[in-house]
């Protein structure tokens, strides 16, 4: 069981009523708290929770409509996402309790200060390298629309400026990361047909490709509901239409693709995790048509080339710079 859940269960008597678990892990916590309900924005965790506790977790970027008497927020990685989630639950809980739980290495001690606008926070427990904080909501805020927290920036592309809408919690929030910047410079000679932006984040690559290749079908895929929402906003801001999907990795992608583009993630929260990318490299051939192309950017220190050649075919380094490389391979 996740150590954060174990800390909650040390105080299980506090969580026996109708409690919302925001950002909960995919463990047995719902089984131990029979009246609790989850709010999840990670598609993989949601699928695991649905398989074990069908109908007891809500997936998306907005707080569930159902009523709840208290809420536990599992500390997200991003400070602005924490603010959004805390605001969303506290706006529904005037005079009642909000709890914040997280690992010490995730910054829970500092994050506890984000409870200050609602009342006087206090530490209830510290165990398993985690802390549990509580506040009684004396100052219930007005709920903030998620779009009001978006950051917007423009990219000067050859086809004209591209407006990017980034929501809290999305990778490289409010700015273009160096890997995507390099890949944007090397979108030439992509195949016609169906293109996938894998791990789309705010939709930068998918929108740029749709702008440059308007007759191609473009799909954007991410595991995170906030990323998918950002991508939809980015597409709409530029008058572009493309399919946006949430799903856990390449297994959620369509078949028969002509190209897969990616600046793949290798962090989950504060943890390093290469599984999604390595799984992409192992299974890309299954999702690509014959002659279909994989084009991805990654940190130069990540040795992806042998894995690509093992599972897809000859892999070339198309470009490199600023500590990143672009790999290109075709399904033979």
Swiss-Prot record:
Single GO MF annotation: 16S rRNA (guanine(1207)-N(2))-methyltransferase activity
Subcellular location: Cytoplasm
EC top class, as a word: transferase
Chief place where the protein resides: cytoplasm
Pfam families for this protein: MTS (PF05175), MTS_N (PF08468)
CDD domains: AdoMet_MTases
GO cellular component, one term: cytoplasm
Enzyme Commission designation: 2.1.1.172
Keyword Transmembrane helix: no
Catalysed transformations (reactions): guanosine(1207) in 16S rRNA + S-adenosyl-L-methionine = N(2)-methylguanosine(1207) in 16S rRNA + S-adenosyl-L-homocysteine + H(+)
Keywords: Cytoplasm, Methyltransferase, rRNA processing, S-adenosyl-L-methionine, Transferase
Quaternary context: Monomer.
Family listed: Belongs to the methyltransferase superfamily. RsmC family.
Function: Specifically methylates the guanine in position 1207 of 16S rRNA in the 30S particle.
Record-given protein name: Ribosomal RNA small subunit methyltransferase C
Source organism: Pseudomonas fluorescens (strain Pf0-1)
